[in-house]
Structure formats: C-alpha cells, structure tokens
Amino acid sequence: MKKEIKFSLVFRDMWQSAGKYVPRVDQLVKVAPAIIEMGCFARVETNGGGFEQVNLLFGENPNKAVREWTKPFHEAGIQTHMLDRALNGLRMSPVPADVRKLFYKVKKAQGTDITRTFCGLNDIRNIAPSITYAHEAGMISQCSLCITHSPIHTVEYYTDMALKLIKLGADEICIKDMAGIGRPVSCLLYQSPSPRDRQKS
C-alpha cells in the first residue's frame, strides 16, 4: 500500500505584508467553499502572523473573523493551523509567558487546531514552552526546523534538533525554509529515515 500524501494550504504573507493584497473576512469566507471543493487539502492556515492587525485596519473584530474563517473548514472535516513565533507568540516582538500561554487558549476557542511553531535561531528553549501551552489548550503542536545552508547546519544538526523536540512532546515536525535557500537533496535527507523512526531504533 502506497503512503497517503496529505496537502496543507498555507497563505504566505497574506496578512502580514502591507505592500501586498490582504483580504477581508467576507472575502475569505467566500473563497472557503472553493478550497473545500478542491478536495485535496487536509489542512488550511486560518490565522497567525499579522491577521489580527489587518482585521483591525479594516474595522473588523479579529476574534469574530477567525471564528468565521475556521467554521466552514471544520464543518468539512479539514483541520486549521496557525503560525506561532515561539518567544514572540503571534507578534514580532517577545511577549510575557502568561500572555503567550493565553494566545493558545484563545486560538483554540476560535477554532484553530494546530500551532506551527518556529524560532528563527532554532533555539529549542524558545520553542519548548509552545509545546506545553499548545497541549494545555488542546491543540496539536507542530514544531519547525528553520532550514539554512552552512557548515554548521548539517543533516545531523537538524536530526538532533528534531529528536529533542519530539522528546519535549512535539506531535509533528515541520521543515521551514524561510529564506528559500534549502537544498532539495538536504531536505530529502532530513526525512530519510524520519527522526521519529531513528528515535525508535
């Protein structure tokens, strides 16, 4: 039996780039049925990054907007996920631990299933609390390996990082190529065999 491949739809920069098109919630809700009808997405990114700021610029209620955007996907059995900047939460600058913890409770209440956490420095100390907070809120914790190319950032480096995150309780591991410089061959090696399989051996 062949391995089933599931696709996740991620909207890059849709809400955080002032120079690009940013949608209102009524436009998002309108396009949701088309995304569902495609029948190929198991997950859809519904919030995170600068989503709330854009809502406010349009005079929308961020809390209401996220609930409206996640609702059609949940009804179709599609999971929703968000971006989380570890120490910064959903913001661009560090936030106190209690505020960061509250982010997860609010996002879960709004209908978000998965938190995709990353730290640009790959500092596990910044990611670890996110794993705990996500689980406490009833969310799936997906942790990212921020990919780059250097003598230090080897396959062993990323495999070791993934194993540490799994040990801390990460439910899933994500490869995040923020700068677009990850090499295809290297990315393949990060997954063969998977860190979770290596942990078992």
At which residue positions do the language-model features occur?
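Metallocofactor- and cofactor-centric catalytic cores in central/energy metabolism, strongly enriched
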Residues: S17, F41, N55
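Generic structural signal for hydrophobic
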Residues: A34-I35, W69, K107, S130, ...
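Catalytic domains of carbohydrate-active enzymes, especially glycoside hydrolases
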Residues: K30-N47, A109
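Conserved small/polar residues in nucleotide/adenosyl-binding loops
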Residues: Y190-P195, Q199
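Conserved, mostly hydrophobic/aromatic
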Residues: M14, T117, I173
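Active-site beta->alpha loop and helix N-cap motifs at the rims of alpha/beta catalytic domains
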Residues: G48-P129, C146-T159
